[in-house]
Amino acid sequence: MKNLYEILEVNENATQEEIKKSYRRLAKKYHPDINSGDSEAENKFKEINGAYEVLGDKEKRKKYDMYGDRMFDQGTGGGFSDFGDIFGDFFGDIFGGFSSRSYSKNPNAPRKGSNIQVELEIDFEDSINGTKKEISYKKKVKCHVCNGDGAKPGTEKRQCEKCHGTGIINDTKRTPFGIFTQQSECDKCHGEGYVIDEKCENCKGKGYEIERKTINITIPKGINNGAIMSVKGEGNDGENNGSPGDLYVIIKIREHEFFKRINNDIVFDMPITYAQAVLGSKIEVPTLDGIEEFELPEGTQPNTTFKLKSKGVPYLNSNSRGDILFTVKIIVPKKINKEQKEKLIKFSESMNQELNVNEKKSIFDRIKDMFE
């Protein structure tokens, strides 16, 4: 039997609060109502509840720490309550009233189809301006030959004689705490509650076939990278006339060669010449809406950042926008001609670029302070 601490993903020194917190997280993750049609998740959910039934109780945990797995094979004592009772005590609030016994499924009840997840890559500009995109994906649909029954037309599926149509096998053991009953999926019908003797040739008894579906979705302005859009009812078809699942589209935004997005602001480096920085100049700044003129002030220093307000990314479902923040980078030419060189020398001499006395003193004082 698997270590109960490992099942709840905690160490043996974990506090009761840590055990409870981990149990809530795992139970929420693997709950059958979230993982509709996923038998592996359902079995994991049962396993988690079984582990918490022991470790969530101080006295039972103490005996488990003492006897380990042997506690399930011997002795008598106080009885176990149904795992679902523990779950129902506090998960109703989290899940809005999920049934505490929903894992004990009725195999003939309608089952919602499972959800589908796809990724959609879009251009940077499309994430800013919004767009419409076509998505093509594969989904499970009801078999058109057997109408989702799984049995060959003209035949019927029959009730499983091992589980009597419940899809569940009860395994009862005596423990130091009394009788312990654990439910598991019937291995004969695989939890379906029925057996198909003559399977539909088209779907091989599965009741569904794979179909490629194409739909159009609208990408809103300002959508974020990694955002998940849900399209209700476009997932896999349900079983026993259950409703279909949903389609979840994960948005992936391609990087832009020039712009970078930080929240709803656009940032980038803007190259300017030495003369533009010194003299000031009207420069053309690229924006999401086209070219914007900007008055660069005289004496602009390298790496100064300027802002174009409300020229950034639109906020979702809002008319407001972020800003554009561009940082000026002074480009130094690698080569200049003779005339340019002579003029630059004259300019340098006229500026007398030697540091004045006050500037020198200020620098020396700061260096001196570093070593005191």
UniProtKB/Swiss-Prot annotation:
Record's keyword annotation contains Repeat: yes
Zinc finger (CR-type): 130-212
CDD domains recorded: DnaJ, DnaJ_C, DnaJ_zf
Localization: Cytoplasm
GO molecular function annotations of the record: ATP binding; heat shock protein binding; unfolded protein binding; zinc ion binding
Co-factor note (free text): Binds 2 Zn(2+) ions per monomer.
UniProt keyword list: Chaperone, Cytoplasm, DNA replication, Metal-binding, Repeat, Stress response, Zinc, Zinc-finger
Pfam families: DnaJ, DnaJ_C, DnaJ_CXXCXGXG
Predominant subcellular localization, coarse grouping: cytoplasm
UniProt family annotation: Belongs to the DnaJ family.
Function as written in the Swiss-Prot or TrEMBL entry: Participates actively in the response to hyperosmotic and heat shock by preventing the aggregation of stress-denatured proteins and by disaggregating proteins, also in an autonomous, DnaK-independent fashion. Unfolded proteins bind initially to DnaJ; upon interaction with the DnaJ-bound protein, DnaK hydrolyzes its bound ATP, resulting in the formation of a stable complex. GrpE releases ADP from DnaK; ATP binding to DnaK triggers the release of the substrate protein, thus completing the reaction cycle.
Subunit structure, interactors included: Homodimer.
UniProt xrefs under PANTHER family: CHAPERONE PROTEIN DNAJ A6, CHLOROPLASTIC, DNAJ HOMOLOG 1, MITOCHONDRIAL-RELATED
Entry's free-text remark on domains: The J domain is necessary and sufficient to stimulate DnaK ATPase activity. Zinc center 1 plays an important role in the autonomous, DnaK-independent chaperone activity of DnaJ. Zinc center 2 is essential for interaction with DnaK and for DnaJ activity.
Stated name of the protein: Chaperone protein DnaJ
Protein source organism: Finegoldia magna (strain ATCC 29328 / DSM 20472 / WAL 2508) (Peptostreptococcus magnus)
Species classification: Bacteria, Bacillati, Bacillota, Tissierellia, Tissierellales
